[in-house]
Amino acid sequence: MTIMRKKHPLLKLVNHSLIDLPAPSNISSWWNFGSLLGICLMIQILTGLFLAMHYTSDTTTAFSSVAHICRDVNYGWLIRYIHANGASMFFICLFIHVGRGIYYGSYMLLETWNIGIILFLTTMATAFVSYVLPWGQMSFWGATVITNLLSAIPYIGNTLVEWIWGGFSVDKATLTRFFAFHFILPFIITALVLVHLLFLHETGSNNPSGLNSNSDKIPFHPYYTIKDLLGILILLMVLMILVLFFPDVLGDPDNYTPANPLNTPAHIKPEWYFLFAYAILRSIPNKLGGVLALILSILILALFPLLNSSKQCGLIYRPISQSLFWIFIANLFILTWIGGQPVEYPFTTIGQISSILYFTIVLVLMPTASMIENKILKFY
């Protein structure tokens, strides 16, 4: 068997990626989230496939087909809730994975980091086009409001919105194409994941110390396969507790009402994992400015390698930058909370302050802190 996995053309690829891969001996549990994301992706593709067998992308039957899945299909309710809450688990793992990359300086592996940003954007696009599919009140109005933001683009905005909608409002054409996009995008994500891993295995993984670990590597199997299996077990436990005890805690009650274009919900909001970006969008009174801030709130990740002036990799030995990082995380939680609140005082003011702080920490304070730390440690 050993000879076969090292010689066979296909098994050799698996061997170099999962078995004999040299990995740093000191990587912590924060490095588990890559494998957890892979498991989440597999869960989403499998449950999504079974849901697609029973779902109909037509405005007259979409809502009833979801009800039919939950009531009449064997374990349809379970598949649906695993898919819905699996998306939340996916984004929790994704945010932690990106946060770990920022904390430990993994953004210095440029190709891996940039492919990761493309993956993040593609995952967000996949989650967004899925929101309209149940054809509930919030999903309909959420899709209408967010797609309508493209009308802020000068000259071509209105035409672009009508082109995406396939008409003059979110209707059958929009639902059909969004379902098609939602079906194909996870497979594109899978292909991008392979590219992400390809670039990662070219350079080797980063580690908590931020130092070169070539002199101290261990094989991925059995050490990290066992560690990843424990992570997967915990993930599945949390997911099943969510699915079986609190299936609707992260959803919106308005989605249990069929979409009605004549009746607008009191507070239109997207899914919880988009709320931080939605809060940034709402905090700018100008429509185009808000859309640009929304896009920049994600694309700012691409600036981390450019803005990094520290002589050390990661924040583990940099107390000033460490404090700023945790303020940044706390600020993200505040933005997520604000995104779910109505547009009124004091929420608008808190949102504006948090949005300014979000960009200030990344663009001004963290580079300044790096330079101060270089001076203190005499790293000229």
From Swiss-Prot:
It comes from the Eukaryota. Gene3D superfamilies: Cytochrome Bc1 Complex, Chain C. The chain crosses the membrane at residues 33-53, 77-98, 113-133, 178-198, 226-246, 288-308, 320-340, 347-367. Its cofactor is heme b. GO terms for biological process: mitochondrial electron transport, ubiquinol to cytochrome c. CDD domains: cytochrome_b_C, Cytochrome_b_N. GO terms for molecular function: metal ion binding; ubiquinol-cytochrome-c reductase activity. It is a multi-pass membrane protein. It is found in: Mitochondrion inner membrane. InterPro entries: Cyt_b/b6_C (IPR005798), Cyt_b/b6_C_sf (IPR036150), Cyt_b/b6_N (IPR005797), Cytb/b6-like_sf (IPR027387), Cytochrome_b (IPR030689), Cytochrome_b_C_euk/bac (IPR048260), Cytochrome_b_N_euk/bac (IPR048259), Di-haem_cyt_TM (IPR016174). Its main location: mitochondrion. The cytochrome bc1 complex contains 11 subunits: 3 respiratory subunits (MT-CYB, CYC1 and UQCRFS1), 2 core proteins (UQCRC1 and UQCRC2) and 6 low-molecular weight proteins (UQCRH/QCR6, UQCRB/QCR7, UQCRQ/QCR8, UQCR10/QCR9, UQCR11/QCR10 and a cleavage product of UQCRFS1). This cytochrome bc1 complex then forms a dimer. Heme 1 (or BL or b562) is low-potential and absorbs at about 562 nm, and heme 2 (or BH or b566) is high-potential and absorbs at about 566 nm. Component of the ubiquinol-cytochrome c reductase complex (complex III or cytochrome b-c1 complex) that is part of the mitochondrial respiratory chain. The b-c1 complex mediates electron transfer from ubiquinol to cytochrome c. Contributes to the generation of a proton gradient across the mitochondrial membrane that is then used for ATP synthesis. This is Cytochrome b.
